[in-house]
Design a protein with these regions (language model features):
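Loop-helix junctions at membrane interfaces
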Residues: 1-184
Length: 184
């Protein structure tokens, strides 16, 4: 369950020399290995753990659902973090250095960073709100029938705020980028 699933993370750089845009290569690699990791966890859950810690009836369906509850938010957060990191740092040279665009336009970088961070925070808060309500307080077992206990008003508000902030700061980053190009 863990050895193979976490070993595939080492494959994240498989597109490094095949895609010219470092951020695109890193994000695609990250999403790809998260998908592989999800598949490993599902196979393990549906075969090894069925009947032990997972109900044996519908073990595969339970494993698909259970593993999606943490792999989907984790994939979104990892992809956003990798996108931000590869936009800020240059990993293509012998020594890791600050990306040239940051040196040229700090306002764009800060705005883009806040944009990504607001989306990541919204995903984390939403995941905590949803998944906390899915855990049976008596047994501690994940119980999808408890989904009605989720405060979807909170989830909707947090999602909306996160998306609005993400878009607003992305626009600010684009505007500052365009104005910096006009100055140069």
């Amino acid at each position: 369950d863990y050895v193979i699933a976490f070993t595939v993370i080492g494959l994240a750089g498989f597109l490094r020399n095949k895609v010219s845009n470092p951020s695109a290569a890193a994000v695609t690699g990250t999403v790809g290995v998260c998908a592989l990791r999800y598949i490993c966890h599902v196979i393990s859950g549906g075969t090894v753990w069925a009947g032990v810690s997972i109900p044996s009836t519908d073990g595969l369906l339970y494993s698909l659902s259970y593993n999606a509850t943490y792999m989907i938010p984790e994939t979104i957060i990892n992809a956003a973090a990798v996108f931000w990191l590869f936009g800020c740092l240059n990993f293509r040279s012998e020594k890791i250095s600050v990306a040239k665009k940051i040196e040229k336009n700090l306002a764009e970088t800060v705005s883009a960073s806040i944009s990504i961070l607001s989306l990541m925070v919204a995903v984390i808060v939403d995941a905590v709100a949803v998944f906390a309500s899915l855990q049976n307080p008596d047994s501690g077992v994940l119980d999808f029938s408890l989904i009605s206990n989720t405060n979807f008003t909170l989830v909707g508000i947090v999602s909306a705020i996160g998306i609005v902030l993400c878009v607003v700061f992305a626009i600010i980053a684009k505007v500052t980028s365009n104005s910096a190009k006009k100055v140069n």
